[in-house]
């Protein structure tokens, strides 16, 4: 996670820890305990591990300056392997066993979709998930703190650049066949519909795999001028 974004989150946390409206689990006179549920193993582990290291770096910086409101920040991470079923188990354990004040640094749309309702149900802040999914933005949820643009905003920027700046209209998409990929697909389709154009081809693949040969063949048959991708890094690298 970008350290500047974490610092912004910490400013918000400073306000939350002083508010009786939020849960007090994980807050003592000396520290604030955060939980992270993310992919620390498996094909998406680079995302989860990178997020964890970024949070730890930002927490370390804050702690060297005295923490937040005089409290040292602590992170307890749990692995979900980028599988929603494991996210549910790990999120419940984080709340019930680790007694965290807030969850931070979730990775992925399907996993956030599994974990966020549990956090919200417990009135626990859900901070900085690595996803631009709409369900975290609409309707407004006071327990969700987003630190990135939505997928719809991002896909609009892609298509605007391709069509306006590069003059490209024959566009295909490679996407992961889950909540993450389907939301990105919807965003691309919306952006293209605004310009009266449509995808010339699409290819999809299952989560937690790099088996994208079939998707590649489907896309290449259409001879697109550009391919946009809504997928983790490793499958895109294979593509």
Where are these regions (language model features)?
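Beta-alpha junction/loop-to-helix N-cap segments that form part of ligand/metal-binding clefts
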Residues: 27, 31-33, 46-53, 61, ...
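Extracellular/periplasmic Venus flytrap/periplasmic-binding protein
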Residues: 86-89, 133-135, 142-239
